[in-house]
Swiss-Prot record:
Transmembrane segments: 12-29
Organism for this UniProt entry: Aspergillus oryzae (strain ATCC 42149 / RIB 40)
Subunit structure: Component of the TIM22 complex, whose core is composed of TIM22 and TIM54, associated with the 70 kDa heterohexamer composed of TIM9 and TIM10 (or TIM8 and TIM13).
Protein name (record): Mitochondrial import inner membrane translocase subunit tim54
Compartment(s): Mitochondrion inner membrane
Comp. bias regions, Polar residues: 197-209
Membrane-topology annotation of the record: Single-pass membrane protein
Amino acid composition bias (Basic and acidic residues), ranges on this chain: 211-226
GO biological process: protein transport
Residues on Mitochondrial intermembrane side: 30-445
Composition bias, Low complexity: 242-252
Function: Essential component of the TIM22 complex, a complex that mediates the import and insertion of multi-pass transmembrane proteins into the mitochondrial inner membrane. The TIM22 complex forms a twin-pore translocase that uses the membrane potential as external driving force.
Intervals, Mitochondrial matrix compartment: 1-11
Length: 445
């Protein structure tokens, strides 16, 4: 046996073990609390998955808007959705549709086009011939067999400040803009008739020109029409909002919406901030979970405030369309302007650069949010009711569980390991296991 002597580690080992041990302990604690916070909101909405639907109804569907953050790709936004938002939607067994934008302006163009399609279906005149897509084919097939949507309010989940600004811009463009695309500006490079009259060629030059035109014709046939490289240009500018009349199909209150935090910062010099956020994801999970649970339960809505009055007394059930606030009550300090505004400080510097070649080009991410009082008054936000907030607190304390169910008894660690890696079975599996009698007849029975 070798002779091992117990002694304290050296100074360098003490520093290494202290740093790595502290970081590991902070990471393990944060992930444990993050999982507990997410489980609290999942248990709050899990009773919705137990509710049965008639065979001729489809599940309530939410619309999720997400786009690539400035300076990064779409994968980061997808991971944020899957990590913080999707678990709560899955716990409630809700259907959702994701609208993604890889570049600036795609969310705005996509939302505006959806609203224009709705207005055309409502009977507003338009010269645009719509192409039949997959969604229209599925909707027609469901209508023929008598399948309808669940009669509950819908909602929009908007992830990130840049997506929120495009969402606001798309709402105004869709409801206040024209249904037909505007005429493209006339090019200034067209030669004048006088210039064409001055160039008079001799008769001998005519055959040569005809031969050259014949040679160019095959080359033109091979050319394919170029596809648009960016999102559809806006049909209306923010300066024209006030001059447009409201369409007949505009409802008294729009579908409720919920903006979701998406903190994202890049850069080597911002490493301390990134480490701090990496070790404090439990706070983000709790905040995002509260917002997502509010739109999933859809029990209470409130209008977006303008800073001139309190919104605590204006909570209304989500199934009732609240009357929009009058235009003269809405000041200039809209709540929609400042939501998630702190995220703009973390954007990459390339997002704030202006296009020198086209300085007048609209930038949805950089330009300030412009709101029309008629649209802003119809916007609603889903919030948790005081009853749901109190129930979530009881769930976190362990005094309550999923609505209508009792909290299961905790299973010891050794038993979980035996069930997972050994030959044991949990009680629920044993209950479902069929009891088979003596089918071989060994006991002469």
């Amino acid at each position: 046996m070798p002779n091992f002597r117990l002694k304290l580690p050296s100074r360098n080992w003490m520093i290494f073990l202290t740093v790595t041990g502290s970081f590991t302990a902070a990471l393990v604690y944060d992930r444990k609390q993050k999982k507990r916070a997410q489980q609290k909101w999942c248990d709050l909405v899990a009773h919705l998955s137990k509710e049965s639907l008639p065979v001729d109804q489809t599940r309530r569907k939410l619309t999720v808007f997400l786009s690539a953050p400035p300076g990064d790709g779409l994968r980061v936004a997808r991971e944020h959705f899957k990590e913080y938002v999707k678990p709560i939607l899955v716990a409630a067994a809700l259907d959702y549709q994701v609208i993604e934008g890889r570049r600036e302006g795609e969310i705005r163009a996509g939302l505006a086009e959806r609203i224009r399609k709705f207005r055309r279906k409502s009977g507003e005149p338009s010269t645009v011939v719509e192409e039949t897509g997959i969604e229209e084919v599925v909707a027609d097939a469901r209508e023929k067999i008598g399948v309808v949507e669940e009669p509950v309010p819908k909602g929009d989940l908007i992830i990130g400040r840049n997506t929120w600004k495009e969402y606001i811009r798309g709402l105004h463009e869709g409801w206040l803009g024209p249904l037909d695309p505007p005429q493209p500006p006339l090019s200034t490079d067209v030669p004048s008739p006088s210039e064409g009259a001055e160039t008079n060629g001799s008769p001998d030059d005519t055959p040569t020109a005809e031969n050259s035109e014949k040679k160019e014709e095959p080359e033109k046939k091979d050319e394919k029409p170029s596809k648009p490289t960016g999102p559809t240009p806006a049909y209306i500018t923010p300066a024209d909002y006030s001059s447009q009349s409201l369409p007949r199909s505009l409802p008294q209150s729009l579908d409720g919406s919920v903006p979701i935090q998406f903190p994202h910062i890049l850069g080597f010099l911002n490493t301390p901030i990134r480490i701090y956020r990496y070790l404090n994801q439990r706070y983000l999970a709790d905040s995002v979970g509260r917002e997502v649970a509010g739109i999933v339960l859809a029990s209470t809505t409130r209008p977006y405030s303008d800073g001139s009055f309190s919104t605590d007394s204006e909570l209304t059930p989500a199934g009732i369309d609240g009357a929009p606030a009058s235009d003269n009550l809405l000041g200039g300090n809209y709540e929609q302007k400042t939501l998630l505004e702190e995220e703009e400080k973390d954007w990459h510097k390339s997002a704030h650069k202006k296009d020198e070649a086209n300085p007048d080009k609209e930038r949805e991410w950089v330009d300030s949010v412009v709101l029309d009082p008629r649209i802003a008054a119809r916007m609603q936000r889903y919030v948790l009711s005081p009853e749901d907030e109190a129930r979530s607190q009881r769930i976190a304390e362990g005094a309550e569980y999923i609505l209508g169910e009792e909290r299961p008894t905790p299973v010891p660690f050794w038993q979980r390991m035996w069930i997972k890696y050994g030959y044991g079975e949990d009680e629920e599996t044993l209950k479902r296991k069929p009891i088979i009698g003596n089918i071989d007849g060994e006991d002469d029975q």
